[in-house]
């Protein structure tokens, strides 16, 4: 029997998850059916209950349900617990539901594919919302020399930094405190790119050979990546690889087989450019 999987979100029309998982399934010879489902904002739990009752094996979760999925799961992986959000649910053999968060590992794997080395580097994370919280543990497990979380509201960044201090050298700063600081990797975890905006960053922030990463993506370089190029970044990347990477981790956790990320990423990138 074909195993059923889905992604839940609202909105959901734009989701690339079904085509990503279809390509993974074809590549690995796995028999599965993956759909996208628009879920009423106040009906997450009952829709998830119905999905699993009808034989569904696993779910990906996107905006705005990641916190709700966190509460819905009967058990959580340590990284999901840290992230405070869940983008992955799986039904275990005893019928219980386990929640995980594959966003951070998706980003880290993408950086590995790009040959970016995180160990020993000074890393600047922009933003202190759910996207940043979701990537902090996997990022710190790569042993950077330092991670600075910069945010408009300093108290939010401070609270986040405090929660991860046991995993490495993490500190918080306001954007106005970044003058004179220099970083090897800058990661934009704000949604500013979606609105064509840029966090208020000073000039001369980048060390020679610096890498800049935007969790958002589009057919054209985001405003943040345009800034990075103007500032002399040696390497830039958007979040399309993170999207495929988190999906690959989910696929592996469901099917115990690791799909090839690069051909899927290449196909998606081509589709993006064709739509321009």
Curated annotation (Swiss-Prot):
Q: What is its EC number?
A: 1.1.1.25
Q: What is this protein called?
A: Shikimate dehydrogenase (NADP(+))
In terms of NCBIfam families, this protein maps to:
aroE, PRK00258.1-2
Task: State the organism named in the record.
Answer: Cellvibrio japonicus (strain Ueda107) (Pseudomonas fluorescens subsp. cellulosa)
- Provide the catalytic activity annotation: shikimate + NADP(+) = 3-dehydroshikimate + NADPH + H(+)
Q: Name one GO biological process term.
A: shikimate metabolic process
Q: Which residues bind NADP(+)?
A: 127-131, 151-156, 215, 239
Q: Which Gene3D superfamilies match?
A: Leucine Dehydrogenase, chain A, domain 1, NAD(P)-binding Rossmann-like Domain
Q: Which Pfam families match?
A: SDH_C (PF18317), Shikimate_DH (PF01488), Shikimate_dh_N (PF08501)
The entry's shikimate-binding residues are 15-17, 62, 87, 103, 217
* InterPro entries named among the record's database cross-references: Aminoacid_DH-like_N_sf, NAD(P)-bd_dom_sf, SDH_C, Shikimate_DH, Shikimate_DH-bd_N, Shikimate_DH_fam, Shikm_DH/Glu-tRNA_Rdtase
User: Which CDD domains does the UniProt entry name for this protein?
Assistant: NAD_bind_Shikimate_DH (cd01065)
């Amino acid at each position: 029997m074909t195993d059923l999987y889905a992604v839940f979100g609202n909105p959901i029309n734009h989701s690339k998850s079904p085509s990503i998982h279809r390509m993974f399934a074809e590549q690995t010879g796995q028999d599965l059916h993956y759909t996208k489902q628009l879920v009423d904002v106040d009906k997450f739990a009952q829709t998830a209950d119905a999905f699993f009752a009808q034989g569904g094996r696993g779910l990906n979760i996107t905006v705005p349900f990641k916190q709700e999925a966190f509460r819905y799961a009967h058990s959580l992986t340590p990284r999901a617990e840290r992230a405070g959000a869940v983008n992955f649910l799986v039904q275990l053999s005893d019928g219980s539901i386990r929640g995980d968060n594959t966003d951070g590992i998706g980003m880290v794997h993408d950086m590995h594919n790009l040959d970016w080395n995180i160990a020993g580097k000074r890393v600047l994370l922009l933003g202190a919302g759910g996207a940043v919280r979701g990537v902090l543990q996997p990022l710190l497990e790569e042993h950077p020399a330092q991670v600075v979380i910069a945010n408009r509201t300093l108290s939010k960044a401070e609270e986040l930094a405090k929660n991860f201090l046991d995993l490495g050298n993490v500190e918080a700063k306001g954007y106005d405190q970044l003058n004179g600081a220099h970083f090897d990797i800058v990661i934009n975890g704000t949604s500013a790119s979606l609105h064509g905006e840029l966090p208020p960053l000073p000039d001369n922030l980048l060390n020679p050979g610096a890498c800049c990463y935007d969790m958002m993506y589009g057919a054209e370089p985001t405003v943040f990546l345009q800034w990075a190029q103007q500032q002399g970044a040696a390497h830039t990347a958007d979040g399309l690889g993170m999207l495929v990477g988190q999906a690959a981790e989910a696929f592996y956790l469901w099917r115990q087989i690791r799909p090839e990320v690069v051909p899927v990423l290449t196909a998606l990138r081509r589709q993006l450019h064709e739509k321009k």
